[in-house]
């Protein structure tokens, strides 16, 4: 089943030994094609870096002592929550906290609930048990936990059912769900996580419901060429979303970071991603999304591969 397979990969694959050996940080200097078998493009980490972390279903960060945040994704339907204990043990062994993204749907292929029905169900209490189960399981974990619910809500590009709700509906649903979760998990931090697009402010649920704000930042060289006619930088891609949320006065993180392009493009992003920038004084963490993109990007550029290391047999 897709949901159980994906969650198992997220939670347990890190315990496996990766088929290749990669540097803990940095980018190889080989001048080769953009997907060299031995290339590692993970962000470069120094003593001054913003706290790094990763969503790592391919186990490339298993032995990376720099990574301090283990990012997990799970649906709130059709999921084996017992596997969270394995993720907790894995994170504690590596002295990492847990960032848990909870998506209000199922990953089953036959899941068919429209936006309005999902919203009505949440507000009507039909999914209270789902969130209670997730948060009750998370309350048993020993690692520090941050809960991120229904991300990128302001970007209705067709990827997420909840992104078709209007701002009022989203805010009401978010507050309802966080109230439920806090009954079981009062010690958690709660992350509100827009993509960073224009209009996101209308979806802000209020200071009482937000401990930290998470953004999504991606750089894809083929898309850059079509959209702006040149390569974009990490700062350039991050600044619009950061500027839109900084007025809320909350700590800010990049909950999902990815970049893909030729060696020069990847090197530039790797060097800048976790560096402290004067433009982003409230940035507290940058968490890499170490997987392929799930959906094709616009302009017929396909599905970017954000993975930091090549997996030639995939």
Each PLM stretch: what is its role?
Residues 174, 178-200, 251-262, 288:
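Aromatic-lined carbohydrate-recognition surfaces of secreted/lumenal glycan-active proteins
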Residues 58-65, 82-100, 134-142, 204-208, ...:
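Acidic (Asp/Glu)-rich catalytic clusters
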Residues 36, 43, 253-314:
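Substrate-binding cleft of secreted/luminal carbohydrate-active enzymes
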Residues 29-129, 259-262, 287-288:
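N-terminal substrate-binding region of glycoside hydrolase catalytic domains
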Residues 196-209, 266-267:
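Distinct, well-ordered alpha-helical segments
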Residues 10-19:
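Bacterial N-terminal signal peptides
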Residues 85-103, 205-208, 212-262:
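Glycoside hydrolase catalytic-domain groove-lining segments
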Residues 81, 86-189, 289:
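Substrate-binding cleft of extracellular glycoside hydrolase catalytic domains
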């Amino acid at each position: 089943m897709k949901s159980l397979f994906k969650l198992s990969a997220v939670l347990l694959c890190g315990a496996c030994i990766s088929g290749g050996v990669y540097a803990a940080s940095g980018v190889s200097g080989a001048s080769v094609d953009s997907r060299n078998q031995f290339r590692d493009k993970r962000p470069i980490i120094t003593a001054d870096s913003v706290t790094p972390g990763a969503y790592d279903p391919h186990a490339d960060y298993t032995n990376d002592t720099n990574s301090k945040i283990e990012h997990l994704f799970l649906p709130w339907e059709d999921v084996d929550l017992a596997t969270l204990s394995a993720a907790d043990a894995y994170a504690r062994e590596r002295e990492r906290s847990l960032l848990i993204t909870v998506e209000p749907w199922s990953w089953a292929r036959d899941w068919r609930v429209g936006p309005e029905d999902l919203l009505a169900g949440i507000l009507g209490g039909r999914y209270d048990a789902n969130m209670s189960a997730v948060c009750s399981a998370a309350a048993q974990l020993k690692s520090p936990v941050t809960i991120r619910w229904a991300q990128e809500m302001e970007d209705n590009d067709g990827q997420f059912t909840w992104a078709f709700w209007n701002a009022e509906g989203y805010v009401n649903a978010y507050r309802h769900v966080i109230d439920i979760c806090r009954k079981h998990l009062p010690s958690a931090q709660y992350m509100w996580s827009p993509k960073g697009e224009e209009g996101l402010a209308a979806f802000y649920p209020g200071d009482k419901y937000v401990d930290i704000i998470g953004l999504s930042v991606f750089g894809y060289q083929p898309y850059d060429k079509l959209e702006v006619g040149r390569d974009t930088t990490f700062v350039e891609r991050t600044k619009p979303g950061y500027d839109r949320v900084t007025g809320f006065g909350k700590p800010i993180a990049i909950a999902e970071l990815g970049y893909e392009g030729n060696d020069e493009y990847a090197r530039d992003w790797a060097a800048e991603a976790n560096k402290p920038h004067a433009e982003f004084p409230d940035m507290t963490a940058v968490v890499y999304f170490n997987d392929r993109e799930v959906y094709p990007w616009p302009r017929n550029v396909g599905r970017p591969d954000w993975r930091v290391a090549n997996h030639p047999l995939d």
